[in-house]
Amino acid sequence: MTNEYLAPFVDELFNLGVREAVFSPGSRSTALAMLFEEYKKYDTYVNIDERSAAFFALGIAKANRRPVVLVCTSGSAAAHHFPAITEAKMSRIPLIILTADRPAELQFVGAPQTLDQTRFFGNFVNHFENLEAPQPQAKNFWTYPRKVAQRAFLSALDQMAGPVQINVPLRDPLVPKLKSENYEKGRYKLPFKFFKGQQSAFFDEALLSSKTLILAGANSAENYSESLLKLAEQLKAPILADPLSNLRNHNSPFVMDSYDAFLANDDLKTDLKAESILLFGQMPVSKRLQQFIALNDEAQFIQVDPALVYRNPSLTTTIMVQSNVTTFANSIQKVNQDFSYLEKWQKAQEKMRHQLEKVAQEENPFEGRFVQELQKHLKALDAQLLVSNSMEIRDIDYWWEKEDSKVRILGNRGVNGIDGTESTALGIATTGKPTVLLTGDLSMLHDLNGLIIGKTHELNLTIVLFNNDGGGIFHHLAQKGVPNFDYLFSTPHGLNFEGLAELTGLDYHLVSNYADFGQQFETSICQPGIHLLEIKTDKDLSLALHKKYTAYEN
């Protein structure tokens, strides 16, 4: 197999609504031109001049108000598209430009008709992506091209429509095998759809199932929690609430907070399978939840977002809705009277929460109990809690329990890095509200110089530091036990945070036990300045305790 994977790409674009394709002759683009033509459903046009071809495609898109495919060969051909691309960008006209290219091994070696086509049109396109040839035995060989087609189509029609570049590196043989059955490969049982604004009748039909699940990720939209709680009550749907969604500030029977733990149970995963899934905000942090979504690959997966961008790495999205959460929730007319699916989730939640709460009896220094202690002392405050990535956000995911509260939990989950946490926390602290940073030792070391601005501007911040002397998260991952594990992954540093606190002018305290933590935290949160409460833990002991308290027993 060489370029057969492009057939589903052609099919998916047609299914989405593309009807016209414009080609300029070329060798490297042979497969693209032939596959579009042999599909026999497109209106195709050939123009020997790429510059003219691009403006011709622009005219079609302008007249019909829908994306048009524009195909060219490798090398200088794409450069001739540039004038029309700039016009499309500024006029907000949707085009999908497919630039055939030489494969990676022929780049930068003097191969003819070859130049760097990466992001060739710069800021004049809404989206750029390489459509690489997937591995022949890959599970997603036929579905991956469809996802690329969906992203291209959605990006071309986003809030500000415009051109999109999909760069297609192609290897010899360039002439494709024209098998009509290839066009249908990788099709989903539920065809992909997208909507802008309200489509209440369609969504009422899509949500006919009584097994509807709501995923609530981080989202700063106004009335986010209230809208989802209203929708959940209407649909009798459990809400799997990521800690950054702040839905755990509501002690609602619809809110689930311990799902990451109990979704480790295979029997439960089967029993809790959904028929409709609604995603709002970012995908929650839980890896087990993402695995559960992949298991529900026959469910109707509806992503609701103001922007037409993917937020589901399991690649199971069937419907994209460009809408804010309140508008969408208000458009749903369906009312479900069947509580049985919700009750299954509530039963698992209650059982798991009972197990997690046993950590309150733990005497060894353990992150899970310290998170519970932190929540207890923050409960009465109108406070802000920034949580660093790596293990800390996962500790919060496991141990932060739903309750009526005003604590706003924040995190940098855009690209999930561990840098910049102190600086971000101090930026949050400028609001004047009580502000806490929960961080790990490596995260803190990445941004020590960020503390300077806090001293300069006399900001107030309490830092709760889990120091396990290195990368504790790797003790939970597949790297645990590999050769040179400590050297390559765990990376113990042995640094003295008391000395670092003295260097940066922080008020420092080494926490000795849980009672000491409570006393020191209550003192620091009420006093001005930057306070560092260091909690030393052991990576191996923490792993053992984590397994002990998160085990779900049938």
UniProtKB/Swiss-Prot annotation:
Cofactor names: Mg(2+); Mn(2+); thiamine diphosphate
UniProt pathway: Quinol/quinone metabolism; 1,4-dihydroxy-2-naphthoate biosynthesis; 1,4-dihydroxy-2-naphthoate from chorismate: step 2/7; Quinol/quinone metabolism; menaquinone biosynthesis
Entry's Gene Ontology BP terms: menaquinone biosynthetic process
Catalytic reactions on record: isochorismate + 2-oxoglutarate + H(+) = 5-enolpyruvoyl-6-hydroxy-2-succinyl-cyclohex-3-ene-1-carboxylate + CO2
Membrane-spanning parts: none
Enzyme's top EC category: transferase
Entry keyword annotation includes Transferase: yes
Keywords attached to this entry: Magnesium, Manganese, Menaquinone biosynthesis, Metal-binding, Thiamine pyrophosphate, Transferase
Domain of life: Bacteria
Gene Ontology MF: a single term: 2-succinyl-5-enolpyruvyl-6-hydroxy-3-cyclohexene-1-carboxylic-acid synthase activity
Short name of one Pfam family: TPP_enzyme_C
InterPro entries, A to Z: DHS-like_NAD/FAD-binding_dom (IPR029035), MenaQ_synth_MenD (IPR004433), MenD_middle (IPR032264), THDP-binding (IPR029061), Thiamin_PyroP_enz_TPP-bd_dom (IPR012001), TPP_enzyme_TPP-bd (IPR011766)
Cofactor binding, note field: Binds 1 thiamine pyrophosphate per subunit.
Gene3D superfamilies: 3.40.50.970, TPP-binding domain
Signal peptide: none
EC code(s) of this entry: 2.2.1.9
Entry-linked NCBIfam families: menD
Subunit (UniProt): Homodimer.
Similarity-based family: Belongs to the TPP enzyme family. MenD subfamily.
Protein task: Catalyzes the thiamine diphosphate-dependent decarboxylation of 2-oxoglutarate and the subsequent addition of the resulting succinic semialdehyde-thiamine pyrophosphate anion to isochorismate to yield 2-succinyl-5-enolpyruvyl-6-hydroxy-3-cyclohexene-1-carboxylate (SEPHCHC).
Name of the protein: 2-succinyl-5-enolpyruvyl-6-hydroxy-3-cyclohexene-1-carboxylate synthase
Lineage: Bacteria, Bacillati, Bacillota, Bacilli, Lactobacillales
Gene name per UniProt: menD
